[in-house]
Amino acid sequence: MARFRTVPVCAAALMAFACSSAFAADPAACRSVRFADVGWTDIAATTGLASTILAGLGYAPTTTLASVPITFAGLKSKQIDVFLGYWSPTMDPIIEPFVKAGTIKVLNTPNLTGAKYTLAVPDYVYQGGLHSFQDIAKYADKLQGRIYGIEPGNDGNALIQKMIGANQFDLGKFKLVESSEAGMLVQVNRAIREKQWIVFLGWEPHPMNVQMKIDYLTGGDAVFGPNYGEARVLTAVPPDYSARCPNVAKFVSNLQFTTSIENHLMVPIMNKEDPQKAAAAWLKGNPQMLDKWLAGVTTFDGKPGAPAVRAYLGAQ
């Protein structure tokens, strides 16, 4: 797809130079870039990075907090432009009807690989004998018959509820406790302080992996997928977004993160720092990432992107 328009003929005196001024700007309607955030710190981090860079390019990014189902409905209705948090395979059953109907497009390249998403326990619970999904029911009393999830409508919660409903691993009498990422982590931290037993939905990247001593349970391949629910995180957009807003689409297709980047960037966000402020500070310390993420990307008005973002960050 075309990312820029070149002038058919450059003046002879300028032929030795790149015709950078020939880049075409996105249409005016593309200046507003509407992201969705489903309330997870990793998505707040990546959305904060993308929004900070887009602001430096002269765009006007905004973020809407919404559940996963509402986010996908927003992409379908074109009220949301970009969602950086499609975790595959756990979200596959939720998004597949939209993709098959042609109302959502998933970009080809994941923005994160090597993620994990499955049930976890504090280290002392693991050392006490709870190593796998098959062990959970044996410790029902210590666990008070509860598995802690995050927000209602979340894909991980749905997998846990399906497991309970089917009485997999003899968990039919267990209860899924839904709240939010923050609410679940409050419960986990309280349990750790009091050395109580708890099993909860864990994932990486997330600061929980460096701030708490936790272990992931084995044996959950049939529920969360192999290798501790190994996941890819992908970017979803409306089906015609790349044609309507090619410059922004090129930018978000360039975005590739690592678990290390996200683990570290999430720490200040967990400490209540604004995601875009945290992103700006991280980008100042890691400016080399801009060259990769802004390859082939211009400012909103068609100028070279990377110099503009560096200047923007320098003024922060």
Sequence positions of predicted segments:
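Pocket-flanking alpha-helical
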Residues: T47, T64-G102, G183-Q187, P207-M212
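Ligand-binding pocket segment of bilobal, Venus flytrap-like solute-binding proteins
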Residues: I80-G85, P152-D221
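Immediate post-signal peptide segment of exported/extracytoplasmic ligand-binding proteins
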Residues: F23-R34, K138-Q144, W293, Y312-Q316
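An extracytoplasmic/periplasmic, membrane-proximal ligand-sensing/linker region
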Residues: R31, T41-D42, K162-R193, V199, ...
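Short, well-ordered beta-strand elements
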Residues: P27-D42, Y59-T64, Q144-Y148, V252
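A bilobed periplasmic-binding-protein/Venus flytrap-type ligand-binding module shared by bacterial periplasmic
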Residues: K116-Y126, E230-R244, V267-P268
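A conserved helix-loop-strand patch within extracytoplasmic ligand-binding domains
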Residues: T103-P152
